Amino acid sequence: QSGLPGTAGAPAVSVPETPRVPSLAQILADPNIPTDTDSAFSALFTQWGFDYAQFAGATGCERAAQVGLRCLFESGTWANLRQLNRPAIIELVDEAGLRHHLLVVRLTGENATLLLAGQRYELPLVDVGRLWFGKYLALWSPPEVGERMIRRGMRGASVVWVRDTLARYGLPRTTSPASELFDTDLEAQVKEFQRRHQLQDDGLVGKMTLVYLSSYSGSASAPVLSSPTQAGVR
């Protein structure tokens, strides 16, 4: 019996195969991978630390309200999702016209990571984008100061929250300590924040501005799509 020196009795070394990543079409066609709305909501609740099945409600948004969260229905682009920086359910329409709801849990430069049935699938944005017409749903947590519009001339804790959150985002404080008055300097900062997030720069802290500000409120429990540098946080 012949053999290479020093190899007698050595166990065979197996090289593991690189796992094959299924295409988006294969994922959508797989009956074992649910793409219904409830499954997407269940995955989204998990990202926020909640068990979807433990709550009652006709819709996912009704269940979200029970834990103090709100639904945000919007139509936008990948850039909008990056700015929002929250996991989001996107609606895809396949070539047969069937609608699928999938949870996006991460965005990098060229790829989106989808969470389906507990498995993560990283797919090119260009592939997902062919079936995505911009519709998405995200959850957000309103600030403790409430959801009422905040505007120039107002005073109170809600104004201080706006100042603190803008400072956390990276805009310089205009008063020290933080003033309770919403003055013209703060209005200018709100407009700058709105422009950077492609919002109407009216200086009014309404729903959409509150939603985006909440992404920088410092809550450790809120899930994010990407790291601060990837999200464009200054």
PLM regions and their residue ranges:
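Cysteine-nucleophile protease catalytic domains, especially the papain-like/related folds used
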Residues: 2-92
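Noncatalytic regulatory segments and standalone regulatory/sensor domains
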Residues: 29-33, 45, 85-93, 111-172, ...
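Helix N-cap and loop-to-helix transition residues
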Residues: 36, 77, 108, 124-126, ...
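Structured segments of extracytoplasmic/periplasmic soluble domains
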Residues: 43-54, 78-84, 91-95, 110, ...
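Short beta-strand-centered aromatic/proline hotspots
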Residues: 100-107
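Short acidic, glycine/serine/threonine-rich helix-capping segments at coil-helix boundaries
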Residues: 150-159, 164-216, 222-225, 232-233
